[in-house]
Amino acid sequence: MLRVVVLGAGAGGGVPQWNCGCEGCRTARAIGDELLRTQASVAFSGDGEHWFLINASPDLRQQLNATPQLHPKPGALRHTPVAGVILTNGEVDAVAGLLSMREGSPFTVYAHEKVLAILSANSIFNVLNEKNVRRQPIAISEPFEPRLVDGARSGIEVLPFAVPGKSAWYLEGKAHPGGETGDGDTLGLKITDKTTGKCFYFIAACAEVTDALKAEIDGAALVFFDGTVWQDDEMIKAGLGHKTGKSMGHVAMSGEDGAIARLADLDIDRKLFLHINNSNPALLPASPERKAAEQAGWQIPADGTEIVL
C-alpha cells in the first residue's frame, strides 16, 4: 500500500507570500486555512512507518510539524520517520529545507549529479554532516530503491526521468557547478510500490508537455503536475514580475499548449496540480479558473491532503 501526503502545494514563496498583496495573497490572509499553501513537497511511504520526501521546501519544519505521520515516535528522544529526501531540481524551494534537517538524524539525499554539484558548491550545506547524511547520485532512466536508515529495503522503486526545464534561477548567467550540458536539472519521478504495482508520478516543474511525457504518464493512478501559472503571462499582466511561466520553466495550466489541454486525452485516474503560484487564479475556490480546472478533472489540493494507492 502506497501512502502519499501533500506537505505543500504552493510555488516559491507559498500563499500568502510574505511581501505580496496580489488578490490570491490578500484573500488567503483574509480567509485563512482554505487558501494557505506552503511550498511544494510531498511525502510517501510503503508501510506507513518509514517515509521519503520529494524535495525539501523552505517550509519543511512547519510541514513536518503539521504532519502527524512524520512526527518522532512516542518515547524517543531523537527520532524521525524520514529516511530520505529525493530532489527533483536545485531550486531554492526544493533544497533550502535540507538546512532544517541539520540536527543529526541520519537520512539520505538522492539527487542527480548536477544537483548534488550545486549542493557541494554551496558550503552552507556542509552543516549536514556527511557521517549522518549520505548524498546518493541518481541517474535518468535508471530505477533505484531508496533504502531505510538501517539499509533495509523500502519496497519502493523510484524511476527518475528528464522533463523539459531549466537550471535553478540563481544560476542564470553563472557557471553551473554541474556543467552546462546534459539533462538532470529538472526531473520527474515515477514512484512504484513493488508489492502492489501501484504508482504515482511527481512532475512539479515542466516547461512543456511533450509527446514523450504524455506516453510516460498515460495510464497512471495518480499524477502530481506543475500548476505554477494559469496563463503563461499572468505575472506580467498582474504587475508581479517580468517573466513568463515558460521562461521560468513552467507550462501554463490553460491554453492550447497548456497542461489541461495537452493531458486531456490521457487515462489518468487522479490529477492534482502542485507548485501553484500565488498569482494563479485557480487557487481561488470561487474563480472561473478553478471551476474550469475541476471540470477538466483536475484537483487543487490543500496542504495535508493524503492519498492511499
From Swiss-Prot:
HAMAP family: PQQ_syn_PqqB. May be involved in the transport of PQQ or its precursor to the periplasm. Signal peptide: none annotated. GO terms for biological process: pyrroloquinoline quinone biosynthetic process. Keywords: PQQ biosynthesis, Transport. PANTHER family: COENZYME PQQ SYNTHESIS PROTEIN B (PTHR42663:SF7), HYDROLASE C777.06C-RELATED-RELATED (PTHR42663). Belongs to the PqqB family. The gene is pqqB. The keyword Transport applies. Pfam families: Lactamase_B_2. Coiled coil: none annotated. It comes from Bradyrhizobium diazoefficiens (strain JCM 10833 / BCRC 13528 / IAM 13628 / NBRC 14792 / USDA 110). This is Coenzyme PQQ synthesis protein B. InterPro entries: Metallo-B-lactamas, PQQ_synth_PqqB, RibonucZ/Hydroxyglut_hydro. Pathway: Cofactor biosynthesis; pyrroloquinoline quinone biosynthesis.
